[in-house]
């Protein structure tokens, strides 16, 4: 049975499923630098689909609503059909990545409470940071919606951070995207090593897409993705 392709991004394809659901097919592509560097990492799509499904199920079990419904096949997720908001929301527990370049903050500083940032999804403009005023002016979301999203992000962190610590992993930061259904905000997109920074507790070993960003070979990246999924799912 063939399904109508609705859209295709760097790492996923979206297909129509029924009136209220879509299929998210995870591709084997891996990218960095707003798509400037691209490769095919065999098996990554399956790993990311399974990782996202596992973590969405974890969130759902704790009362956090996501778009996850179930799996269509090993690399394809059945999800609620959302009107997605073109904003990436990042929660940072420990400083790394762009924040240490943008601000006088040192690598490894611990944020208590966590820092939450909003970025416009726009590769050409390199995903500029947004504040409440920008988002209201651009009609992306109201201030009340932004505050609700911040509340959800903190709740997600309260679930994920201790869960990963129980696996001897540190959640440095993570990114989520949100959509609306009947004016309700719901977590959409994915929750994978493409959208989280994970370090091994103690050693500081990188177990996420930062390996690829820093030039590691594809086999090393794949082994990290495999190890991460094995550790969280055991």
Swiss-Prot record:
InterPro entries: SAICAR_synt/ADE2_N, SAICAR_synt_PurC, SAICAR_synth, SAICAR_synthetase, SAICAR_synthetase_CS. It comes from the Archaea. Pathway: Purine metabolism; IMP biosynthesis via de novo pathway; 5-amino-1-(5-phospho-D-ribosyl)imidazole-4-carboxamide from 5-amino-1-(5-phospho-D-ribosyl)imidazole-4-carboxylate: step 1/2. It catalyses: 5-amino-1-(5-phospho-D-ribosyl)imidazole-4-carboxylate + L-aspartate + ATP = (2S)-2-[5-amino-1-(5-phospho-beta-D-ribosyl)imidazole-4-carboxamido]succinate + ADP + phosphate + 2 H(+). GO terms for biological process: 'de novo' IMP biosynthetic process; cobalamin biosynthetic process. Coiled coil: none annotated. Keywords: ATP-binding, Ligase, Nucleotide-binding, Purine biosynthesis. Its EC number is 6.3.2.6. One of its GO terms (molecular function) is ATP binding. SUPFAM superfamilies: SAICAR synthase-like (SSF56104). NCBIfam families: purC. Belongs to the SAICAR synthetase family. This is Phosphoribosylaminoimidazole-succinocarboxamide synthase. The gene is purC.
């Amino acid at each position: 049975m063939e399904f109508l392709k609705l859209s295709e991004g760097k790492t996923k394809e979206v297909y129509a499923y029924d009136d209220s659901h879509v299929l998210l097919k995870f591709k084997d592509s891996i990218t960095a630098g707003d798509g400037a560097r691209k490769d095919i990492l065999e098996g990554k799509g399956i790993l990311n689909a399974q990782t996202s499904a596992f973590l969405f199920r974890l969130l759902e079990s704790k009362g956090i609503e996501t778009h996850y419904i179930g799996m269509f096949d090993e690399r394809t997720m059945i999800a609620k059909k959302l009107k997605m908001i073109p904003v990436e929301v990042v929660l940072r527990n420990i400083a790394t990545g762009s924040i240490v370049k943008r601000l006088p903050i040192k690598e490894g500083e611990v944020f208590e409470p966590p820092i939450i940032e909003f970025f416009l999804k726009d590769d050409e403009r390199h995903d500029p940071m947004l504040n409440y005023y920008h988002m209201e002016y651009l009609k992306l979301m109201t201030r009340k919606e932004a505050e609700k999203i911040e509340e959800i992000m903190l709740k997600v962190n309260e679930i994920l951070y201790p869960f990963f610590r129980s696996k001897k992993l540190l959640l440095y930061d993570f990114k989520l995207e949100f959509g609306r259904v009947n004016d309700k905000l719901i977590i959409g997109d994915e929750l994978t090593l493409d959208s989280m920074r994970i370090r091994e507790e103690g050693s500081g070993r990188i177990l996420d897409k930062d390996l690829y960003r820093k030039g590691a070979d594809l086999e090393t990246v794949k082994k990290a993705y495999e190890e991460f999924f094995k550790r969280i799912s055991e």
